[in-house]
From Swiss-Prot:
SMART domains: MUTSac (SM00534), MUTSd (SM00533). GO terms for cellular component: cytosol. It comes from the Bacteria. Keywords: ATP-binding, DNA damage, DNA repair, DNA-binding, Nucleotide-binding. Belongs to the DNA mismatch repair MutS family. The gene is mutS. It holds the Pfam family MutS_III. InterPro entries: DNA_mismatch_repair_MutS, DNA_mismatch_repair_MutS-lik_N, DNA_mismatch_repair_MutS/MSH, DNA_mismatch_repair_MutS_C, DNA_mismatch_repair_MutS_clamp, DNA_mismatch_repair_MutS_core, DNA_mismatch_repair_MutS_N, DNA_mismatch_repair_MutS_sf. This protein is involved in the repair of mismatches in DNA. It is possible that it carries out the mismatch recognition step. This protein has a weak ATPase activity. Transmembrane segments: none annotated. The keyword DNA damage applies. The lineage of its organism: Bacteria, Bacillati, Bacillota, Clostridia, Moorellales. This is DNA mismatch repair protein MutS. It comes from Moorella thermoacetica (strain ATCC 39073 / JCM 9320). NCBIfam families: mutS1 (TIGR01070), PRK05399.1 (NF003810). GO terms for molecular function: ATP binding; ATP-dependent DNA damage sensor activity; damaged DNA binding; mismatched DNA binding.
Length: 863
């Protein structure tokens, strides 16, 4: 950087402000641009594809800039890449400043605090999370700075913490010093989530944390809140970070509340991923997920509400019934549903609009969008005047039309406000008498100046004479050079151009003062009036937020009803029993992506007498689709949705566990078998009698003997110890004997039609078992050459069924190094069931490092 003594006053000001925000890119307001200097300029130029220039003389400073009116898009790009940006504004009008313009940082934008709608996912959340460990307990708090949502919870172990974080997918984590230095934790966060990590100071003790929260929200707001020590420390971190970065009152931020845990089903990361609840496939696309099927919402609030319901299904039969009754009323009320959808189409994101008001960044267009959204509430209330379901009646009671605010904004704002609030044209004529007078004076003044041009042409005889204006010289009279001899004596020369001269007269200057003075006062008055309007909105933010939440619930209910009608779903019976009975159940996603009418439905029956199904059958026959569809139907029932079945009776499930093949490549550097065993270990550790367990091909990642042994032992443990309802799809035909040994086990298989060599998978699950794999048939479906298929048949016929071998030459026994032997011995003795995922992962990393070292030794010895 330049030497201090060589800096101009403005650059010295820049240096002083930048020193307070060393970890941020500083957007430094200069007129109509945000400028960046030195290292910030080099980073911004590279990341934003800007032209890098220089400022200054001998020790020039690299610089680049972006127009202030387009800054949001550039800001979003930087924050999206993980940078923090400090916004430094001019705090006074440069024309009125005495000396250097006063500048201050008005907010710091980070990945977890960005509020611009264009930079955020519509219908999604952008969470800032704080993690604290206190007395062996994990405290977790999270807030959406754009909507005001603020929640906390505690986690008994790191595994549960990671599961919560995968559900929330925060954009930014706040970690206190010791955790910010915890490389293992940071590695976990990087593997499982996408958020950036920010070190932040934690309160000295839980009492100080609670006091800071009460100082901000008030004692009454937290009077009934039970705030565990670790969670309180995390919540206080969130608040202190927002206060430090946003530089405002955070009026829209709700008092922290405990996240519902006992009344909601907890879904771990494996289940969410394996059932493809919100994303699908290796590319993690929304299309093909359950949310893709269910989300017919029309508002951002509705989309967020539906996503929350899907993330946390209910475990209370009464609450489920309330949602079902509301959905049923909307299913039956076609006209009501359609007319409500029409009203909701024009509703903008009220939660984020409220947030922008709180941050002081809402302009005329945002307030007009707020007014337009609230204006539909009376019509919605009228449509819902006769609803009878309890939940819809609650929604209606919570909808506040805010007539007073809608009327005020309608009278005050023009229909199409300009983007800027500092250039006038935002206040409607008739709202304020002084505005009307100034606007008339400015308009008449401009008319007088326009008429002056005709008068001067007449007086001077110069037909090409014209009156113009620019910001530097103001109004002027321009005369071309050939006509200069005709210029009157009262013309005062102002500027000389190549082909013309510019003049002023006393009359023109007087009119200019009148016009510009009126315009300047008008712009200032409109700005002040607009600030007053924003304050009025600020005063009713809680009412707006309550209405936004109610609209979100209504929209989500309508979405579920729309899907139920469009896809022929039925209302399930949900109770506290243990029965899962599904008649003609269908997979909600697969039935939509395939050809219409081709999906084969299946029945399911589980109860306390027969609670484990062993399902055998060939690959590609439909086993995996069947077991997943049962899990999805149960989940849909417990969010209060109708389900894809002819009839369904669901005994409440406290958790759904899955081990299916979709996760085989999810952990870089880990084998299929290790991933599989970790997921199975988690299931055996956490499942209860009320759980639903979905297992697909357990044990396939190791030898046949080991895999079969593990699969059998796992099934016995679920049957004898846990007692959970379980669907187990397997290629181990030997497991069917368990039905004769364990009273709760039943065998099912996929029906197959054989006609000579032609085989058809009927995709129907029927009682019984099969000992055929139809592997060669599947190979034909996959496109293997006929020559290969024929050779496979010959080999199969020559070998005993259970001892197929194709190797004809003895294999030389490999020679192991001492280090490799050590790894094998440690692996053989490792207690996988007692290890947490983090401990297992760390152990694998250590073994991998040892093997790399041994490999290097072998290579050097051969070299």
């Amino acid at each position: 950087m330049a030497r201090e003594q060589a800096l101009t006053p403005m650059m010295a000001q820049y240096r002083q402000i930048k020193s307070q925000y060393p970890d941020c890119i500083l957007f430094f307001r200069l007129g109509d641009f945000y400028e960046m200097f030195y290292e910030d300029a080099e980073v911004a130029a590279r990341e934003l594809d800007l032209v890098l220039t220089t400022r200054g003389g001998k020790e020039a400073a690299p610089m680049c800039g972006v127009p202030f009116h387009a800054a949001d898009s550039y800001l979003a790009r930087l924050v999206g890449k993980g940078y923090k940006v400090a916004i430094c504004e001019q705090m006074e009008d440069p024309r009125q400043a005495k000396g250097l313009v006063r500048r201050e940082v008005i907010r710091v934008v980070t990945p977890g605090t960005i509020t611009d709608e264009k930079a955020l996912t519509p219908g999604g959340n952008n969470y800032l999370a704080a993690i604290v460990r206190y007395n062996g307990c994990w405290g977790l708090a999270w807030a959406d700075a754009s909507t005001g949502e603020f929640l906390f919870t505690t986690c008994p172990d790191q595994e549960t913490l990671v599961d919560e974080l995968v559900r929330l997918m925060p954009s930014e984590y706040l970690l206190p010093g010791e955790l910010a230095r915890d490389t293992a934790l940071k590695r976990l966060l990087q593997i499982y989530t996408r958020g950036v990590i920010t070190g932040w100071q934690v309160a000295s003790n839980p009492e100080a944390a609670r006091q800071s929260l009460e100082d901000h929200f008030g004692h009454e707001a937290l009077a009934g809140v039970e705030l565990p020590a670790a969670a309180g420390l995390a919540a206080a971190m969130i608040l202190s970070f927002l206060v430090a970065t946003q530089h405002n009152s955070l009026a829209h931020l709700e008092a922290p509340a405990a996240a519902a845990t006992t009344s909601r089903m907890f879904l771990d990361q494996a289940t969410r991923r394996n059932l493809e609840l919100v994303t699908a496939g290796r590319e993690q696309k929304r299309e093909g997920s359950l949310l893709w099927v269910l989300d017919k919402t029309l508002t951002a609030m509705g989309a967020r509400t539906l996503r929350r319901w899907l993330d946390q299904p209910l475990v209370d039969a009464g609450a489920i019934k309330e949602r079902q009754e509301a959905v049923a009323e909307l299913v039956e009320g076609f006209i009501l549903r359609q007319e409500l959808r029409e009203r909701l189409q024009v509703v903008r994101d009220l939660e984020r609009l409220a947030g922008r008001v709180a941050y002081g960044t809402a302009g005329g267009r945002e307030l007009q969008a707020l007014r337009g959204s609230l204006a539909v509430i009376p019509g919605i209330l009228e449509l819902m005047s006769e609803v009878h379901s309890r939940l819809l009646a609650q929604v209606r009671a919570q909808l506040d039309p805010l007539d007073d605010l809608v009327d005020l904004l309608g009278r005050a704002l023009v229909d199409d406000p300009p983007a800027s609030i500092t250039e006038g044209g935002i206040i409607r004529t008739g709202y304020n008498g002084e505005v009307d007078k100034l606007r008339e004076a400015a308009t008449h003044g401009r008319d007088w100046i326009a008429s002056l041009e005709a008068e001067e042409r007449e007086r001077t005889g110069i037909k090409s004479l014209k009156v113009g204006y620019n910001r530097v010289f103001g109004y002027y009279i321009e005369v071309t050079r050939p006509n200069l001899p005709q210029v009157p004596a009262d013309y005062e020369r102002k500027q000389t151009l190549a082909n013309a001269e510019r003049f002023v007269t006393r009359r023109l200057q007087e009119l200019e003062r009148q016009v510009l003075g009126a315009e300047e006062r008008l712009v200032q008055l409109e700005y002040e009036l607009f600030q007053g309007l924003r304050e009025e909105v600020l005063g009713v933010l809680p009412r707006i937020q309550a209405t936004a939440r109610a609209l979100g619930v209504l929209d989500a209910l309508i979405s579920l009803a729309t899907v139920a009608v469009d896809n022929n779903y039925t209302c399930p019976r949900v109770d506290d029993g243990t029965v899962i009975e599904i008649e003609q159940g269908r997979h909600p996603v697969v039935e939509l992506v395939g050809s219409p009418g081709t999906f084969v439905p299946n029945d399911t029956y589980l109860d306390q007498e027969q609670y484990i199904q062993i399902i055998t059958g060939p690959n590609m026959a439909g086993k995996s689709t069947y077991i997943r569809q049962v899990a999805l139907i149960v989940l849909l029932a417990q969010i209060g949705s109708f389900v894809p079945a002819r009839r369904a009776h669901i005994g409440l499930v406290d958790r759904i566990f899955t081990r299916v093949g979709a996760a085989d490549d999810i952990f870089a550097g880990q084998s299929t078998f290790m991933v599989e065993m970790q997921e199975v270990a988690g299931i055996l550790k956490h499942a209860t009698r009320r759980s639903l367990v979905i297992l697909d091909e357990v044990g396939r990642g190791t030898s046949t003997a080991d895999g079969l042994s593990i699969a059998r032992a796992v099934t016995e443990y679920i049957h004898n110890v846990i007692g959970a309802r379980c669907l187990f799809a397997t290629h181990y035909h030997e497991l069917v004997s368990l039905a004769e040994e364990l009273s709760g086990v039943r065998n099912y298989c996929v029906a197959v039609l054989e006609e000579g060599e032609d085989i058809t998978f009927l995709r129907t699950i029927v009682p019984g078992s099969t000992d055929k794999s139809y592997g060669i048939h599947v190979a034909r479906l996959a496109g293997l050459p006929e020559q290969v298929l024929e050779r496979a048949r010959e080999i199969l016929e020559q070998q005993p069924r259970a001892q197929v071998r194709v190797l004809t030459k003895p294999v030389k026994k490999p020679t192991l190094t001492p280090g490799e032997v050590q790894v094998l011995e440690e692996l053989a003795g490792y207690n996988l069931m007692a290890a947490t995922p983090l401990e297992a992962m760390e152990q694998i990393f250590r073994w991998q490092k040892m093997l790399h070292k041994e490999l290097d030794i072998v290579k050097r010895s051969r070299g």
